[in-house]
Design a protein with these regions (language model features):
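Alpha-helical metal-binding/catalytic segments enriched in His/Glu/Asp
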Residues: 73-76
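Extended beta-strand/beta-hairpin segments
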Residues: 3, 7, 11-71, 82-163
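Ribosome-associated translation termination/rescue signal centered on the conserved GGQ peptidyl-tRNA hydrolysis loop
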Residues: 78-80
Length: 163
């Protein structure tokens, strides 16, 4: 049975004729019948692999999809923090964010708590500048963490390491 045959007519048009004008896109493809691995090709031409846990039929060959959601959120936040610090003329030389998350016990198992811990390295970094950069990312710029904040309690911690 074709995928389009499984959906009512109103959805068939969307599946066969994508809506034009979306500024971001991604195509996810299942990699075969012997597991639960998927490859995602982004609109910018990059490929990311995903796989499921063995207890879910996967082979543990790549991150889980929700791990990539968490990683993407960390990347979004770290990007913002570094950019804000650079624009504030801070001599930042490194930034690492460690994320810890909890998910709901029942489906859809959304994130319910996420903690970000930033380790920012640099020469003479001002604590107020680091705190401000993290705050601006969390409250204004990081679309990923702002979206996840709709279902999860989000907290932040940070430390500065002199480089």
């Amino acid at each position: 049975m074709l995928l389009t045959e499984r959906f009512p007519l109103k959805f068939r048009h969307i599946l066969t004729n994508p809506i034009q004008g979306y500024p971001m896109e991604c195509t996810v493809q299942w990699l075969g019948p012997n597991g639960m691995a998927f490859a995602a090709r982004t609109g910018s031409g990059h490929i990311a692999a995903m796989d499921g846990a063995p207890e879910g039929g996967g082979n543990n060959l790549a991150p889980r999809p929700m791990e990539l959601v968490l990683a993407g959120t960390g990347g979004c936040a770290a990007y913002d923090v570094v950019l804000i610090l650079k624009r504030s003329r801070q001599e930042v030389s490194g930034c690492e964010v460690r994320l810890q998350a909890e998910r709901a016990e029942s489906d859809p198992k959304v994130f319910t708590r996420i903690h970000f811990h930033f380790t920012v390295r640099g020469k003479g970094l001002k604590a107020d500048a680091v705190k401000r950069a993290i705050h601006l990312s969390a409250e204004k710029y990081c679309s990923a963490s702002i979206m996840l904040g709709k279902t999860a309690e989000i907290t932040h911690g940070w430390e500065i390491v002199e480089a």
